[in-house]
């Protein structure tokens, strides 16, 4: 145990050292100042040339060649059709009507939302109509969270009230701290965050519709209290998970600091109440929080809305969302990018790596996106932010590999034709590493700001008259019917699926070898 604690302490000291170096350098240089803006003017001018979608309202005529019947399907102004309209198309052979088969929801919209707009072909991302580049340049995460939640940027007094409400809910119950401290010293921070979010449901029974009635969330006051609670407590829980990993006790939050400053304070103050993080370092983190705050119906947001549709409390719904974000295909991509860049090693190895990708022998992480078929607008901001950070602390050798890899890929027809551009994960991991965060903490840095997006969708779903408990259909492909037989009469085919060999520990083997008389 002593060696493990020593290792954790060494890792913690190393991380604090990197943070101290970065903080000292940032003290003399303003990140995101007017002299070197994140927002390049051409970004907005290019967006202004993209016209809003036209009115697509109309009708489709569907002719069923099985029966010769024709059906008229209404098309909404947004270009959608109701899936249930296809249920009326039947073969006349006692079927239940057509179902739409869409694995992965590639072309299915289960909700109508006004929170986030994405045009993947044009590389556009907007929160409530505001370009992400503009918000990253001029706003703060807390202000953006208000925008996502309530639809408009707050006035000065509204912002002050909002900041106060969030900061006043930043402390977590002692019982929750005890739960976190009881976890293994090497517990993955995302596992800690998922568990803690779920446990908050127990500590706040006043917010549970299962205990207080299904109409509980019809109260705007009740909703808003949960929003402030979660936004306030998320960084505190995340900091406790980080400190647990480093073998250190949790630190009380400070209500006098900004959102990002408070988070860094809890990580690095070592309990010194006079400690204050460098404001420029906090600004770097704040911009990253803005970029990760919302991204419409991604896997984890869809999970949050799916769970919330059952009427479950918001803490359980968000615990499920964070669990989805824990998946390596969703929240762990920037860690995969770092691993890839380390494997490439040097710029000289890039041509060989590129050929390996094209021959399907290697996998390129950080390129391509389910939605974007253009350069991810968040990646543009993050790359500029990375350049700022590395110009201050010195260039990590991997940034040279990353820049050269991007240049090689964007000059290769193989990637251009497939519209594989850098995404938000390509550079973010490099920034987090330079700031001293261990790779296992990267998805937590994704989850903290994404709470704002989850909560905005939760609030929106509560007011949406079309919200129903989510219950997707399936296409049954199993055996039609068979009858029960006693075990001794069953003939099992060798091709039948069966339990694989379950490994046991040596201690279990020792126990099984003993006498049972």
Regions found by a protein language model. Give the residues of each.
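N-terminal chloroplast transit peptides
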Residues: 1-28, 35-37
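Hydrophobic alpha-helical bundle cores within soluble ligand-binding/oligomerization subdomains
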Residues: 2-5, 26, 40-517
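Intrinsic-disorder/low-complexity regions
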Residues: 33-35, 63
């Amino acid at each position: 145990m002593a060696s493990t604690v020593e290792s954790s302490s060494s890792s913690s000291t190393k991380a604090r050292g990197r943070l101290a170096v970065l903080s000292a350098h940032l003290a003399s240089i303003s990140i995101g100042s007017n002299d070197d803006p994140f927002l390049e003017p051409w970004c907005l001018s290019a967006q202004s040339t993209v016209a809003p979608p036209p009115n697509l309202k109309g009708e489709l005529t569907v002719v069923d060649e099985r029966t010769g019947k024709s059906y008229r399907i209404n098309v909404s102004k947004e270009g959608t059709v109701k899936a249930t309209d296809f249920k009326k198309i039947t073969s006349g052979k006692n079927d239940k009507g057509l179902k739409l088969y869409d694995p992965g929801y590639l072309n299915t919209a289960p909700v109508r939302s006004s929170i986030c707009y994405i045009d993947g072909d044009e590389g556009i991302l907007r929160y409530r109509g505001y370009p992400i580049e503009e918000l990253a340049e001029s706003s703060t995460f807390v202000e953006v969270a208000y925008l996502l939640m309530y639809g408009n940027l707050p006035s000065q007094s509204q912002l002050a009230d909002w900041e106060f409400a969030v900061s006043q809910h930043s402390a977590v119950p002692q019982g929750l701290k005890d739960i976190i401290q009881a976890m293994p010293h090497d517990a993955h921070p995302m596992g800690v965050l998922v568990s803690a979010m779920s446990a908050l449901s127990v500590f706040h029974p006043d917010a549970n519709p299962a205990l207080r009635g299904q109409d509980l969330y019809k109260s705007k006051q009740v909703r808003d209290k949960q929003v402030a609670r979660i936004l306030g407590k998320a960084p505190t829980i995340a900091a406790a998970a980080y400190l647990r990993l480093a073998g250190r006790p949790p630190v009380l939050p400070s209500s006098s600091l900004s959102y990002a400053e408070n988070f860094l304070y809890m990580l690095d103050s070592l309990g010194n109440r006079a400690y204050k993080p460098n404001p420029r370092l906090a600004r770097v983190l704040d911009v990253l929080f803005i970029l990760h705050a919302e991204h419409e119906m991604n896997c984890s947001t869809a999970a949050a809305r799916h769970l919330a549709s059952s009427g479950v409390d918001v803490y359980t719904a968000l615990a499920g969302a964070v669990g989805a974000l824990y998946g390596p295909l969703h929240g762990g991509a920037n860690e995969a990018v770092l691993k890839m860049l380390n494997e490439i090693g040097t710029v000289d190895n890039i041509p060989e790596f590129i050929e390996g990708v094209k021959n399907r022998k290697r996998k390129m992480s950080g390129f391509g996106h389910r939605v974007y078929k253009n350069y991810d607008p968040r990646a543009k901001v993050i790359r500029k932010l990375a350049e700022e950070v590395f110009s201050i602390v010195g260039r990590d050798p991997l940034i040279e590999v990353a820049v050269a890899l991007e240049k090689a890929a964007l000059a290769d027809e193989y990637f251009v034709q497939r519209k594989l551009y850098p995404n938000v994960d390509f550079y973010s991991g490099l920034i987090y590493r330079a700031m001293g965060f261990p790779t296992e903490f990267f998805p937590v840095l994704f989850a903290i700001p994404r709470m704002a997006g989850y909560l905005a969708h939760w609030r929106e779903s509560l007011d949406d008259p079309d919200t129903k408990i989510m219950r997707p259909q399936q296409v049954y492909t199993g055996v039609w019917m068979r009858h029960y037989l006693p075990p001794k009469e069953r003939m099992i085919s060798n091709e039948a699926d069966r339990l694989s060999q379950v490994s046991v520990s040596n201690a279990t083997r020792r126990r099984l070898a003993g006498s049972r008389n």
